[in-house]
């Protein structure tokens, strides 16, 4: 499973989905997560539907983790079959919280 994490500094989940300029992509095998890729998004605050460009950057992912997301972007992710998780803090902590939740839900 691929997880995209919105981060401006590569260390913290600290970005709104539609305004995120970078995503760290992790591969989660059910036990641990490893970094696969870093993806840049050309953010243009004047662009009305920035979230569409952002969605293109993560369209091969199963989960997106960001601080917040707008309603249209959330529907766009859902239509693409991508689950959104709202969280913030150090990426390692956020990923571990998600893994614990995932394992709990699978048990």
Annotate each language-model stretch with its function.
Residues 55-85:
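Mid-chain, well-packed structural core segment of small domains
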């Amino acid at each position: 499973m691929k997880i995209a994490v919105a981060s401006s500094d590569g260390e913290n989940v600290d970005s709104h989905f539609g305004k995120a300029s970078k995503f760290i992509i992790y591969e989660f095998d059910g036990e641990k997560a490893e970094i696969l890729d870093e993806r840049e998004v050309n953010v243009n605050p004047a662009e009305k539907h920035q979230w569409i460009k952002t969605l293109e950057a993560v369209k091969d992912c199963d989960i997106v983790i960001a601080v917040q997301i707008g309603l249209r972007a959330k529907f766009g992710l859902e239509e693409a079959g991508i689950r959104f998780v709202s969280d913030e803090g150090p990426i390692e902590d956020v990923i571990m919280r998600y893994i614990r939740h995932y394992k709990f839900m699978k048990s």
